[in-house]
Amino acid sequence: MANLDLLEKSIPVAPIKIAALKGCEELGKTVNDYLVQFRKELMEHRTNGIAWSGYAEESFLIDCDCPRFGTGEAKGVINESIRGVDLFILCDITNYSITYKVNGYENHMSPDEHFQDLKRI
């Protein structure tokens, strides 16, 4: 349970964003839906001010990806600005079902490859 008294008396430090990596999209959507609903309900009792800008958003998910090259190497791409936000990254490093192609062959992502994608973002 959230301590609502503490939340109602405090001012947010920075807006938040969520980066849900491959294999965590469903969890990211669930967390996002909860945060959107919770913060909208909390903002009903607040007055709007500069400190509260970005507190209640339609979505906290960011557009990010880790595209793979033909060699199996990848790069992290964030398609929007995250300057000045608190970024939370969701990654399931034990998800073996995510695949990518290397030299025409299907390869399953190992925990190390998931961790490398986490570091790239």
Give, region by region, the residue ranges found by the protein language model.
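PRPP-associated nucleotide enzymes
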Residues: 1-121
